[in-house]
Amino acid sequence: MCIRDRNYSVREHGNRIGFWRILDLLDKYNIKPTVPVNAMLAERYPRMVQECIDRGWEIAGHGISATQMITSKSSEIEEKAIITRSLEILRERSGSEIKGWFGQDFSQSTRTLKLLSEFGIEYAADFPNDDTPYTTNYNGLICIPNQSEWDDTQLMAIRRLMPWRWRDVVIEAFDYLYNEAHPSGTVMTLSIHPWLLGQAHRIKYLDEALKKMTGYKDVWQTSAAEMATHYRNNM
């Protein structure tokens, strides 16, 4: 088996096995996440999308596939085509309006926010430059903080942290933000991927992190869309 085939197979494990393990954990802790879904996954794994819809989870735009990213080298025509196809497929498969956007691997061009606002997107979650939401100059589009510093791919796949250290990082970050939150509040988003944390040797560390975080009082666990709406109405 070549390296490319192996990489595809590892990620397919996330769709076949890891997703369902994480699904069970989120149900266990009554967590309703925002799920960024690319167009290719929505077409190839409709049952996964339906499971999210049935639970009332938010579906957000996430491009076409991991191999078709928006970058600074993308032309405006290419970028519009990616956004258009992504949103069309997700709206068709989910039966709901798509309000948010998570760029593939946090990627975008200098025009992405402007284009997203023109497509009716209300928030983007690609910038780790704050701990609270903030508005942009693009038709009121809101940026939801999304830290790469505790993203599972960034820490475990790229920086090679052990899963127990990832758990500790997440809990330490949550604890600090919780204590810093009063009175204005802070936001912590946690990006996870089924192909990575859904593995048998890692899933228990996600369980332990979620157990710890859901044990805190006065924490609002919500979707990115609800967070954006709340911020817009109260800023």
Label for each model-derived stretch:
Residues R4-C143, R167-L190, L196-M235:
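Catalytic alpha-helical scaffold of carbohydrate-active enzymes acting on polysaccharides/glycoconjugates
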Residues I144-R165:
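Positively charged, amphipathic and often flexible ligand-engagement surfaces
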